[in-house]
């Protein structure tokens, strides 16, 4: 993403996330909320709060009125509604991608879930 936040403890990244801005709109997309799986869970919780709150503040500072995100991670579903005042708007979302020039289609594992990777390998 063009804009983003990384939260560290003692110089070690704990979590990060990005923000895409819809140019000419008041709409932003928060994406790629990732964590260090080896980090202490309490540290991860605190850092995620800071990261997501910072992304929301970044969106506000850029004049955005809406921030949208999508995730299959149940822990993030709960976090978004409990700690970040987000509203669940869709429950059964499937994501789609079109490679416009053919340069990315050879390996889509970086953006695919395990089920889709298994389907590609059949």
Predicted regions span which residues?
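A conserved beta-strand-loop-helix scaffold within acyl/acetyltransferase catalytic domains
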Residues: 1-10, 14-35
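Histidine- and aromatic-rich ligand-binding microenvironments
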Residues: 6, 70-72, 99
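Short loop segments at secondary-structure junctions
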Residues: 10-11, 38, 99-103
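Polar/charged alpha-helical tracts
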Residues: 12, 53, 57, 61, ...
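Acyl-donor binding region in acyl/amide transferases
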Residues: 28-85, 90-91
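C-terminal "cap" of GNAT-fold acetyltransferases
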Residues: 92-122
């Amino acid at each position: 993403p063009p804009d983003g936040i990384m939260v560290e403890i003692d110089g070690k990244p704990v979590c990060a996330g990005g923000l895409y801005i819809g140019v000419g709109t008041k709409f932003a997309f928060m994406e790629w909320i990732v964590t260090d799986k080896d980090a202490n869970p309490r540290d991860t919780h605190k850092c995620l709060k800071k990261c997501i709150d910072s992304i929301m503040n970044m969106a506000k500072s850029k004049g955005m009125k809406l921030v949208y995100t999508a995730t299959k991670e149940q822990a993030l579903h709960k976090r978004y509604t409990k700690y970040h005042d987000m509203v669940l708007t869709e429950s059964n979302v499937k994501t789609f991608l079109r490679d416009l020039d053919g340069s990315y289609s050879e390996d889509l594992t970086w953006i695919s879930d395990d089920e889709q990777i298994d389907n590609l390998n059949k």
